[in-house]
Amino acid sequence: MPVRFRGLSEYKRNFRWKTPELCSPSQEQKSPWAGLRSDQLGITREPNFISKRRVPYHNPQISKSFEWTGDCDSDDPVETEALKTAESLAEHSNDVNQENTETPEGPRLPPKVRSHSSDSGVETALALAGNSMKKTPPVAPPNQKEAFVSPKKEAEKVNNGLHRVLQRKGGMNTPHLSTFPRNSEYQSQFVWKSPHEKSPILAAEEALYNTKREELIQKPAEDASKQEKSEQKHPKRKNKQHISQKPLSLHTHRGKMNTEYRSKFLSPAQYFYKDGAWSRIRSKVPNQASQNPLNSMWYMEVRELRARAKAYRQRIEGTHFSRYHLNQLLSDNNSLWDVSSNSSSEEGISNDIRALDLAGVSEKETAPRPKMLQQPGSREQSHQDDTEKKGLSDAPTVPVKRRLVWGEQEGTAEKDSQQLREEEEKENEQAAVVTQNLEKNNEGINEDNRIEGENTCLPNSPAAVSESSSVSSEPGGRLPTPKLRALGRAQRTHHDLTTPAVGGAVLVSPPKFKSSTSQQRMRSLGTDPSSVGQGAREASQRRSFRPGAKLKAVSLLTSPPAGLGTVDPLPLRQDQWHPNGVSGETVAINSAYQERSSTPPVLKSTKNRPMPCWSPSPRIQGTLKDPEFQHNGNVGNPKMGSFQLPLQERNYNNEDDRLSQISARSAASSSLASQILERAQKRKEDFWGKT
């Protein structure tokens, strides 16, 4: 047999577990409850139950007049009168229906006697005994086989009932009898479950305790009489004793047990922060409780800061975003877009993630850009072949300064600006030749017809397209097509009216300002045809040398966190329409486009003349309102830079680059896809609100 260590270990000495004694009450706690009703325990009001109490039903055939009252003294006149009337009624009913009468099997229990005395338990038992002695069954018909209860069994029942009451008063465990009545409504509905069998040691202790209790109960009657006399002399003392006799609670509170968890993990209210360390509040040390509310406030502040840090970390990791952005990233149309990122840093990423990441610009593609800029001759020759294959006019357009994508270096932008300045100096030398050629071509034409012809042909020319496209490619939202822009107002779509410009939404609305240039353009209709070249050059200057363009683009790139409301920095245009005819001018556009495409040298010289003031070319007034031409940016003028072109075309920065971008954008499915692509190209550094 192995020897087990039965001593107290260090853990048991320091930390005590709750013993099961608290769950099972001891005999001292159970003895005052035994055999007492709720009114004796100090409960003067029973609980309200929702359901009706089920009262046992007795057959009302036999009245109380059949109860034997011969042994009792009929001192009460009311009872005797009631008994006489009941007997007379019973005799009459027996005479009429003797065959239908039935006799009870045994004596019924009397109604519950409620008394507020402390020893009413004994009284109920005695009353039961007396009533059972008084009751004798009536004469049974001869055909009934059931025998009556003998007087010996009656006496045994009385003795058992008295002994049972004494046992319950003494605190002994007495089994519940089905015939014994419940003392209160609560006990009748909520009965204690039968306890488990006790061990022999507990049974022996209970026997010893019960013998002591029986000795206390069986006191002589003299002590009881003396106590009654003293209560009659001093009634106040009786009330005090009755009030002081409160039942012991079933679970006595011995204080909180010092468990291991409670000793190690205390609430933050029991600590205070001092000199960079947390220390526990001691009850003996003064001036510590005053700092307790401040410490709790500090604790709540720490929790709030941790919650904020978690939110910021989720934003950086990309797990905190708007569902609108997720809808754009997981769109099926992403497969139609050009993959613009093949850098070495993303070689380990799967193809699906690389297809979703549309903001990348490869280092391999941007590196040969300076070399391509040093070869203008070969570039022009190769691009002319491309334009002839595509069926477009080979007339070059105005050079446009490209906006920086996040992956490009600032040095390339500086080289672009220097290249533009050199080209514009060459344009100044050819300005006079352009004006003379235009005057010779238009000498024999009437002035009114000349204005109308210029209006119809120039909007479709590559120069006009490049001019309007260059203005439309502002850092903000989309400007209308060249035809709609001549009208002074773009026809709005549901995208223009509902979507904001920042925060992952589509940028489709034009700026709301009415520039002085547009007013001068309306006044200068019918002026000298040399204004065509001036307008194109002025548009290129405004596009390439605008000082506030870069700042505005930076402000739009910094989008707020997802889920927050945004303000549209580019409101809708509020210009007015100019009602004019449509039918004749639309036919003239196609003929004028073929006419101008056959004379590329003349139009090429129009872009080379810078002028000090803005002199726009004559425009079509009030035309192209037909829904056939309202494609929301598909006709020649979606926003510039919305697509990443192939490597050859993206490295250009002159008129060939402009024409290739126009041809690529004309193949786009809609303006919505192009704007989403541009939004995705700017998101890697600035999409999550990083500064």
UniProtKB/Swiss-Prot annotation:
Pfam families named among the record's database cross-references: MDM1
Top-level taxon in the UniProt lineage: Eukaryota
Keywords: Coiled coil, Cytoplasm, Cytoskeleton, Microtubule, Nucleus, Repeat
Lineage, highest ranks first: Eukaryota, Metazoa, Chordata, Craniata, Vertebrata
Compartment(s) of residence: Nucleus; Cytoplasm, Cytoskeleton, Microtubule organizing center, Centrosome; Cytoplasm, Cytoskeleton, Microtubule organizing center, Centrosome, Centriole
Renumbered ranges of motif ST]-E-Y-X(3)-F motif 2: 184-190
Any one GO BP annotation for this protein: retina development in camera-type eye
The organism of origin for this protein: Gallus gallus
Location of the motif ST]-E-Y-X(3)-F motif 3: 259-265
Gene name of the record: MDM1
Segments of skewed composition (Basic residues): 234-243
Keyword Nucleus: yes
Protein name, entry field: Nuclear protein MDM1
Biased composition range(s): Polar residues: 514-533
GO cellular component annotations of the record: centriole; centrosome; cytoplasm; microtubule; nucleus
Motif range (ST]-E-Y-X(3)-F motif 1): 9-15
Region (Disordered): 87-155, 219-254, 360-552, 594-658
Residues forming coiled coils: 411-445
Biological role stated in the UniProt entry: Microtubule-binding protein that negatively regulates centriole duplication. Binds to and stabilizes microtubules.
Biased composition (Basic and acidic residues): 219-233, 380-392, 412-423
